């Protein structure tokens, strides 16, 4: 009887977990509008963060190297249509 127990092999009754190629996600880039239509902004304020030109710069608005739109002067923000299928954002100074 002892000889049969010597050859006894124990196997796992649950398989190993293994690995997966999922489980990662990039951080959100916080893109989109940073100023609303009709809002008063100061010069240099970021109006819209984007990748590419979803919205084009209008009056008194500049475009940064990463396509971010920013106000060149202090004024009121206006989101407008540019032709049939494009949009632009402009900043109009407030008359004092």
UniProtKB/Swiss-Prot annotation:
<dbReference type="InterPro" id="IPR001684">
    <property type="entry name" value="Ribosomal_bL27"/>
</dbReference>
<dbReference type="GO" id="GO:0003735">
    <property type="term" value="F:structural constituent of ribosome"/>
</dbReference>
<keyword id="KW-0687">Ribonucleoprotein</keyword>
<feature type="propeptide">
    <location>
        <begin position="1"/>
        <end position="11"/>
    </location>
</feature>
<protein>
    <recommendedName>
        <fullName>Large ribosomal subunit protein bL27</fullName>
    </recommendedName>
</protein>
<comment type="similarity">
    <text>Belongs to the bacterial ribosomal protein bL27 family.</text>
</comment>
<dbReference type="Pfam" id="PF01016">
    <property type="entry name" value="Ribosomal_L27"/>
</dbReference>
<dbReference type="GO" id="GO:0022625">
    <property type="term" value="C:cytosolic large ribosomal subunit"/>
</dbReference>
<dbReference type="InterPro" id="IPR018261">
    <property type="entry name" value="Ribosomal_bL27_CS"/>
</dbReference>
<dbReference type="GO" id="GO:0006412">
    <property type="term" value="P:translation"/>
</dbReference>
<feature type="region of interest" description="Disordered">
    <location>
        <begin position="13"/>
        <end position="36"/>
    </location>
</feature>
<keyword id="KW-0689">Ribosomal protein</keyword>
């Amino acid at each position: 009887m002892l000889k049969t127990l010597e050859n006894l092999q124990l196997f796992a009754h649950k398989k190993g977990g293994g690995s997966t190629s999922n489980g990662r996600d990039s951080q959100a880039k916080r893109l989109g509008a940073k100023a609303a239509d009709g809002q008063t902004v100061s010069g240099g304020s970021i109006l819209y963060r984007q990748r590419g030109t979803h919205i084009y710069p209008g009056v008194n608005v500049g475009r940064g190297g990463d396509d971010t739109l920013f106000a060149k002067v202090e004024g009121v923000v206006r989101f407008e249509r540019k032709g049939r299928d494009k949009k632009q954002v402009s900043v109009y100074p407030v008359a004092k």
